């Protein structure tokens, strides 16, 4: 093996190292001997060459594979290539000997290796100490290299802020370790010229690594243009390539596999069930806690910072012109998934709605009925409605309407104080006890001295009003209660009418002086002569079912008690009212079995005559409940369950129909000064649905006032007679009486004034019944009440 070939195999850089024992391995080369031989003794070349031959032979003992691995591992920056070694030999050898070496190398290179210019990638320069310094060329990588293109002006300081070099004239180092000087900055004029003549790729920014203006390349500008124009940055990419239907182009009729579905796909997994049951058992036994409460150490740990998001929350004030959006109306019954049947449209309504234009429809949808909430489908107009709502909120102008700051109490009429409206009854003065059972009715005589009462025991009792002493009593029936007692108006006689069972009894109580008693008996006996003069009815008239009853004389026992006449009505009468002259009175039999033609009867006292003014049932409102004569006109007011009708008896015409709006009328009364001082007719109505209604016939057929102060049904209402005191009262099943002030004037422009005055309580509720009747003293502001507890009370 020749020397040139060995030198070609291994060439080392000449370095000054300490002389040590030569250790040859696959990773290190001892070039100290070779370097010393070339530099110290130029005349011992032959001996040195022999030594080098031995060294080279030792090196050649290694395999070629190890040489290749060593060449790959050695760094090119630390160990020079073959060209570098030969160049070093040229510089260190003698001129004559160096030429021989070069000649040998050239001969070998011409035969075995490329030219020296292609292999050498460095140049030798002298450093500051005069030593040789190898300067390598920049790496020019090819397509197969791992290196990228190296910029000539690249700053290789790494990820270091340039602020570290603010105090130095340079800004970094290049790959050779040379300083990269800070670029010169132009003056104001240069900056102006640069701004006028903007070069292509100018950005106005400064490159942080070089300090020079940052310019974009043509490729970067083209990329920015495509991004700005929403174009595809990559060239040659077609986003609209034709779709290849790989799986749907051919229709497969037969299944790919006809194997039946395995049972495990639709049967619950037993293994999963076992795992779940293990977890459930562990949870039940407490070995697994679904929620582990925090320990006291965690709660009291001060190192854990807990932030309160709403600690510093402050409400933001609304804009001065802020107007809140109007709220949507709440949904109605028609929007329910299971609405009532009356809200569901019929076929005709549905067809009409479908044929109408959307603008002409009264609603945006039709109510539908679903059996359950899970059957309700999605609402198809949901998005449309929300969009229209957004349009309304966005486009519709809003107007702030200023509310009137009016005190609600100022809108109410100024009512006088109850203290200014005295006298009126405030306390119970006398209690009348003696009846067994309920006291259903009572009445005060026109003189104001006597009180008559009737109850469930079938007796009529007369009391002295002020003392409460019983003066007279008569038992009219053994089984039926006394429903009504009324005194004949007028002071010329003392006649008491009472309705018990199917009969009407007329009596003269023996409690007055003989002259008054004789005058009363004469009035009752005068009718017997007129009745005897009337010719008897024909056989055809006698065979009629609903003939008027004939007045009869009472039995001897009743006659001895003071009863003078009996009228057999054949039906139970619940209402009895006298005409103001005292010659007529009207009775009402409201029973459901009572024929309509005999329900209302008018009786003439002077003729002992009974007439039926109505041949047919009053239309609407059910059977009649009560009837009263007008205090100054020949008008009869008849009330059924829901309406009150006024009939002119002289002309036999229907004058007016009143609609109180009550479900069941219990009683009513007419103002005593109607059409005289007040200029119009006024009446009050009580109903079983707890309402007290005031009617002004000149205003409307509807109630002028509706008062709801009772908790239970109202049984009776009554005006103070004579009109001396503008008072009226009502009696209710809640055990109380309520006293009202109700004044009317002759001025047609002013309405009635109604003021609640007093609530009188004293009767006990017995069998869900309280106060059953009420009446006034004819001259004093006193009232008397009858209760279901078997007592009567005088309120003063």
Swiss-Prot record:
Annotated Acidic residues bias: 47-84, 102-119
Q: Where is this chain primarily localised?
A: nucleus
Q: Which UniProt keywords apply?
A: Nucleus, Repeat, Ribosome biogenesis, rRNA processing, WD repeat
- Comp. bias regions, Basic and acidic residues: 123-134, 345-366
This protein's superkingdom?
A: Eukaryota
Lineage, opening ranks: Eukaryota, Fungi, Dikarya, Ascomycota, Pezizomycotina
Mark out the compositionally biased spans (Pro residues). 326-343
Give one GO term, molecular function aspect. Answer: ribonucleoprotein complex binding
Q: Where is this region: Disordered?
A: 1-134, 320-366
Please list the residue ranges that the record marks as compositionally biased, kind Basic residues: 1-12
Natural source organism? Aspergillus fumigatus (strain CBS 144.89 / FGSC A1163 / CEA10)
Which parts are the WD repeats?
434-473, 477-517, 619-657, 660-705, 709-750, 766-796
Q: Which family does it belong to?
A: Belongs to the WD repeat BOP1/ERB1 family.
GO CC annotation terms, alphabetical: nucleoplasm; PeBoW complex; preribosome, large subunit precursor
**Where can this protein be found?**
Nucleus, Nucleolus; Nucleus, Nucleoplasm
| PROSITE patterns linked | WD_REPEATS_1, WD_REPEATS_2, WD_REPEATS_REGION
Q: State what this protein does.
A: Component of the NOP7 complex, which is required for maturation of the 25S and 5.8S ribosomal RNAs and formation of the 60S ribosome.
Name of the protein this chain belongs to: Ribosome biogenesis protein erb1
Name its GO BP terms in alphabetical order.
Answer: maturation of 5.8S rRNA from tricistronic rRNA transcript (SSU-rRNA, 5.8S rRNA, LSU-rRNA); maturation of LSU-rRNA from tricistronic rRNA transcript (SSU-rRNA, 5.8S rRNA, LSU-rRNA)
The UniProt record lists the keyword rRNA processing: yes
Q: Which proteins does it associate with, and in what oligomeric form?
A: Component of the NOP7 complex, composed of erb1, nop7 and ytm1. The complex is held together by erb1, which interacts with nop7 via its N-terminal domain and with ytm1 via a high-affinity interaction between the seven-bladed beta-propeller domains of the 2 proteins. The NOP7 complex associates with the 66S pre-ribosome.
Question: In the UniProt record, does the keyword Nucleotide-binding occur?
Answer: no
